[in-house]
């Protein structure tokens, strides 16, 4: 998939007062705890009209999860046919290009990834968003986390989701742990690989200092609520960061809408 930085090809009503595109590219429509409350693409499109937000429906998977093979990917893509929504896939791991064909991946509007499924020293994955995750040596964790993030950003993806997220136990040390050198290393990787940095409303990341540094380096940004059904369309944090850090329409990534065929 070739990444294109394009103007927001949206109707005039989907722009903010600062002329920024009102696009939520991190919207999950399935509620695993309450499946009956899950949304259809048509319902999402209707909600977008009500909220004045264009949605990117983000499926999850790769070689496992909801999207785990070509059949499940095609089913997801076909479910959005005829709806004014973007189609995205949040991938996990690094083997997903082996499980999903290039032909089907090209039917997506964008692919995102994050570093929150983190390899522990014992070889087991650590799910960084869980509440009881702790690291005895925060500095050692950060060195490994930054290196792993750079690896994630080297993939053929368009959006870095949940950027600079830290486990709950380390959030109070965010400014100290995300040193200028560490920030610059991941920013340089994002810019080099043309990956947009998500302004994430759920986790309220990244920081303004990070956004300013990334803008100075020529990075692009995207808006994402990172919500499941309830709360999708909330891009307030991203809009606030954009205003605070002087982002303009040209700084914001909006996908090229591809045919569902």
Residue ranges of predicted features:
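Charged catalytic cores and adjacent phosphate/nucleic-acid-binding surfaces used
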Residues: 2-13, 18-23, 174-261
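Alpha-helical transmembrane segments and their juxtamembrane interfaces
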Residues: 14, 36-38, 119, 172, ...
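A metal-dependent hydrolase metal-coordination microenvironment
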Residues: 19-143, 147, 229-232
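Conserved, mostly hydrophobic/aromatic
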Residues: 26, 111, 162, 197, ...
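Alpha-helical scaffolding segments of alpha/beta enzyme cores, especially the outer helices
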Residues: 43-46, 71-79, 103-106, 147, ...
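Short loop/turn motifs at secondary-structure junctions
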Residues: 51-54, 107, 155-159, 246-248
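Short secondary-structure transition/capping segments
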Residues: 71, 99-111, 133-142, 166-167, ...
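Domain-core and long-helix interface of multi-subunit machines
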Residues: 115-118, 125-219
């Amino acid at each position: 998939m070739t990444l294109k930085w394009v103007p927001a090809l949206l109707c005039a009503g989907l722009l903010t007062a600062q002329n920024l595109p009102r696009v939520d590219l991190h919207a999950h429509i399935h509620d695993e705890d309450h499946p009956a409350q899950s949304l259809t693409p048509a319902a999402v499109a209707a909600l977008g009209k009500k909220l004045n937000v264009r949605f990117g429906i983000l499926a999850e998977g790769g070689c496992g999860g909801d999207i785990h093979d070509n059949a499940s990917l095609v089913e997801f893509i076909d479910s959005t046919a005829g709806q004014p929504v973007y189609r995205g896939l949040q991938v996990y791991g690094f083997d997903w290009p082996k499980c999903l064909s290039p032909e089907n991946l090209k039917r997506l509007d964008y692919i995102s990834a994050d570093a929150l499924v983190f390899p522990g020293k014992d070889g087991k994955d650590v799910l960084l968003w869980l509440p009881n995750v702790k690291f005895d040596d925060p500095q050692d964790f950060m060195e490994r986390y930054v290196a792993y993030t750079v690896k994630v950003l080297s993939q053929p993806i368009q959006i870095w989701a949940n950027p600079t997220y830290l486990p709950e136990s380390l959030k109070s040390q965010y400014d100290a742990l995300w040193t200028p050198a560490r920030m610059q290393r991941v920013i340089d990787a994002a810019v080099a690989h043309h990956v947009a940095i998500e302004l994430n409303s759920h986790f309220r990341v990244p920081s303004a200092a990070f956004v300013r540094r990334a803008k100075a380096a020529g990075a692009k940004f995207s808006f994402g609520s990172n919500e499941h059904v309830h709360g999708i369309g909330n891009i307030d944090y991203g809009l606030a960061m954009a205003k605070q850090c002087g982002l303009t329409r040209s700084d914001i990534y909006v996908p090229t809408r591809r045919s569902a065929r």
